[in-house]
């Protein structure tokens, strides 16, 4: 089973569990063995709670015995990893920073409560760029996560630990958070599916904030249908998050390709786009046209302002959100013998951040 985990989807797990092909306990033990075997190379996890995972698996097996398949919770027995900026009661939550190295979450984030209600099994907490600020997971204060497809490459970030854990066959799926690409970019780098939900559709209560007006929690999975299943489980209004709202239900299970309209923004195919990327996107457009999908050229003239706006909003909100940690603990000293050396090291960090 350990070799199967890399290719097991959420739907396959639920089917096999309900058919008694294997138990939730067996599945979790296989995940834990894979983590022990692969972590020395991948470094996707910051903490793993074997005892909690096995307890949850036993509960899942009991429910599977007692309930019919149609009455089982939506994510029954599915092992999931959680980005380490989302609070899970009793587990460490570091946000990839030594400032929070010994912080233990005193309560569950709303998404964790909802995952538990849906029957998911929490395996552990995944690595991230410090306070979710980064795009490579090289900026974690603890370790550098590798891309399981190519160990010489980064997994993306800041949810790189979650993406690597799923793509590397350590867990079936994971939660990440996104402000400016932190779910979708690592999902792309690792060859899996990432969804940043519409702002307000998923509660941020229990998420260590980066930029509050942009942050969202979302799934990283192997299939689109798996992402949909997790999104269905975690979405909804929350009295603890005033930005959440009720969105209209889309009860239609599937759409005919002929019913779909896809916009092609002309501004996205400028000379700045990598030729290989543009070529692949154009191939997809051709394939969709062959399937009778309606392709419509649109204009998004304000797109060019998106990045400058992001770099005004995100640092401003981050400085306010992270001010609460100021003075909690002294930072790690740089290795420098003189003040000039210290200035040099500091300037290297600043230049690297700007680039």
Annotate each PLM feature.
Residues 1-52, 290-292:
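An N-terminal boundary/leader segment
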Residues 53-55, 70-142:
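Acidic/His- and Gly-rich active-site-bordering loop/insert found
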Residues 196-279, 284, 340-346:
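A short helix-breaking turn/cap at a secondary-structure junction
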Residues 108-234:
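Short glycine/serine-rich loop segments
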Residues 31, 53, 108, 227, ...:
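Residue-level signal for inorganic ion chemistry
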Residues 75-95, 256-265, 316-355:
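Short helix-loop capping/hinge segments that flank enzyme active sites or metal/cofactor-binding pockets
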Residues 24, 28-29, 58-61, 273-299, ...:
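Acyltransferase
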Residues 59-74, 250-258, 350:
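Short, basic, low-complexity termini and linkers enriched in Ser/Thr/Gly/Pro
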């Amino acid at each position: 089973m350990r070799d199967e985990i890399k290719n097991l989807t959420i739907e396959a797990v639920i089917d096999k569990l309900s058919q008694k092909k294997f138990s939730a306990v067996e599945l979790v033990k296989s995940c834990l063995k894979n983590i022990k075997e692969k972590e020395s190379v991948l470094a996707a996890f910051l903490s793993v709670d074997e005892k909690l995972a096995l307890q949850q698996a036993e509960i899942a097996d009991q429910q599977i015995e007692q309930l019919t398949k149609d009455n089982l919770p939506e994510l029954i027995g599915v092992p999931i990893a959680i980005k380490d900026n989302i609070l899970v009661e009793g587990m460490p939550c570091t946000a990839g920073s030594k400032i929070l190295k010994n912080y233990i979450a005193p309560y569950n984030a709303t998404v964790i409560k909802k995952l538990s209600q849906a029957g998911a099994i929490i395996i552990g907490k995944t690595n991230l760029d410090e306070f979710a600020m980064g795009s490579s997971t090289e900026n974690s204060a603890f370790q550098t996560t590798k891309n399981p497809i190519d160990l010489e490459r980064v997994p993306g970030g800041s949810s790189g630990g979650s993406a690597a854990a799923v793509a590397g066959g350590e867990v079936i799926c994971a939660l990440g958070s996104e402000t400016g690409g932190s779910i979708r970019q690592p999902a792309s780098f690792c060859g899996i599916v990432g969804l940043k939900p519409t702002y307000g559709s998923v509660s941020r209560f229990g998420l260590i904030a980066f930029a509050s007006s942009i942050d969202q929690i979302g799934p990283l999975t192997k299939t689109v249908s798996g992402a949909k299943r997790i999104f269905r489980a975690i979405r909804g209004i929350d009295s603890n998050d005033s930005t959440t709202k009720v969105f209209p239900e889309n009860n239609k299970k599937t759409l005919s390709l002929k019913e779909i309209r896809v916009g092609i923004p002309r501004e996205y195919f400028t000379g700045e786009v990598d030729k290989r990327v543009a070529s692949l996107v154009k191939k997809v457009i051709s394939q969709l046209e062959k399937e009778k999908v309606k392709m419509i050229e649109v204009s998004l003239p304000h797109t060019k302002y998106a990045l400058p706006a992001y770099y005004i909003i995100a640092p401003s909100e981050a400085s306010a959100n992270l001010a609460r940690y100021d003075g909690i603990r002294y930072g790690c000293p740089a290795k420098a013998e003189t003040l000039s050396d210290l200035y040099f090291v500091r300037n290297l960090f600043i230049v690297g951040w700007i680039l």
